[in-house]
Amino acid sequence: MFRRLIGVVVATVLLSFQLLVGSATAVELDKATRTVPLNAEGETTVLSLKQVKEGKRLFNYACAQCHAGGVTKTNQNVGLTPEDLALATPNRNNIEGLVDYLKNPTTYDGEEEISEIHPSIKSADIFTAMRNLTDEDLEAIAGHILIQPKIVGTKWGGGKIYY
């Protein structure tokens, strides 16, 4: 009888503690972390927490099959690191550049269109994950790509040595 009473008391205390504490929430990213380049002219924008969350979800849905961890499975020499994006032609190290790429992808040097082999809005009939993405969705994905180096550091795009 005493054991049963102790068990009930312990269970009651633990359940009461759960109600008082509530569920755990993710650490909110500060404004500096959420500030990313908007365009090649140097303007910046601050992503909302909703955009950050949605960007991660959409990236995992539409992009992570080939770009998990910021690498490119089909070409290990070019990833989604800030350096790789900045050296592309046109510069893709900003929201507008990445959104343009997601609409109409080109080779790293910008010379040839590759929409038939890279998912994009232009090739949504082939790559169905891109079908229903809006411009806001593309901006959220671009924002996710641009804040990852600030969150995970050199692991983003680091390749096999990290994963």
Swiss-Prot record:
Keyword Amino-acid biosynthesis part of the UniProt annotation: no
CC cofactor note: Binds 1 heme c group covalently per subunit.
Subcellular location per the Swiss-Prot or TrEMBL entry: Cellular thylakoid membrane
The keyword Membrane belongs to this UniProt entry's keyword annotation: yes
Pfam families: Cytochrom_C550
Entry's Gene Ontology cellular component terms: photosystem II; plasma membrane-derived thylakoid membrane
UniProt GO BP: photosynthesis, light reaction; respiratory electron transport chain
Subunit details: PSII is composed of 1 copy each of membrane proteins PsbA, PsbB, PsbC, PsbD, PsbE, PsbF, PsbH, PsbI, PsbJ, PsbK, PsbL, PsbM, PsbT, PsbX, PsbY, PsbZ, Psb30/Ycf12, peripheral proteins PsbO, CyanoQ (PsbQ), PsbU, PsbV and a large number of cofactors. It forms dimeric complexes.
Entry protein name: Photosystem II extrinsic protein V
Organism this protein belongs to: Nostoc punctiforme (strain ATCC 29133 / PCC 73102)
Gene that specifies this protein: psbV
